[in-house]
Amino acid sequence: MKKRIIIGNWKTNKTQKEVKEFFKILNASLKNKNICCTFGVAPVAIHLELAKSLAPKQMIIAAQDANYISSGAFTGTISWSQLKDIKIKYVIVGHSERRMYYNETDDIVNKKVKNLLENKMIPILCIGGNIEEFNNKKTYQVCATQLKKA
């Protein structure tokens, strides 16, 4: 059977206080429970270390994105090497919002996937079309292309 992993993407939500409250409630609700699946969250980058410190040990803390270049003049991005340094193993790549708002192409997604794999990290690949592609019944074709190019 394939391993299933459930990751909640927090996008640009939650303050430090809200992160602490989330994990307080989560940890209390998981007490003495047998968890039958692998699960995690992808908080905004500034909360990664806080989330790691508060999360139950079996929980995955993932990054929402990573630059495929390890360092340099890339204001506002976080590099795979910075994530690896704080022991973040999972990284979301190819999210529709990154494709739409930051013009990330299939080629950029491919570079990110390859770079993460080369550095023994795990990409969480997002594929999917937009509403126009859905209405034109091109979702399958778009997903197949994105998957192939990644």
From Swiss-Prot:
The keyword tRNA processing does not apply. Transmembrane segments: none annotated. Homodimer. InterPro entries: Aldolase_TIM, TIM_sf, Triosephosphate_isomerase. Substrate binds at residues 9, 11. The active site is at residue 95. This is Triosephosphate isomerase. CDD domains: TIM. It is an enzyme of class 5 (isomerase). Its EC number is 5.3.1.1. GO terms for biological process: gluconeogenesis; glyceraldehyde-3-phosphate biosynthetic process; glycerol catabolic process; glycolytic process. One of its GO terms (cellular component) is cytosol. Belongs to the triosephosphate isomerase family. It is found in: Cytoplasm. It catalyses: D-glyceraldehyde 3-phosphate = dihydroxyacetone phosphate. Keywords: Cytoplasm, Gluconeogenesis, Glycolysis, Isomerase. It comes from Mycoplasmoides pirum (Mycoplasma pirum). Pathway: Carbohydrate biosynthesis; gluconeogenesis; Carbohydrate degradation; glycolysis; D-glyceraldehyde 3-phosphate from glycerone phosphate: step 1/1. It comes from the Bacteria. One of its GO terms (molecular function) is triose-phosphate isomerase activity. It holds the Pfam family TIM.
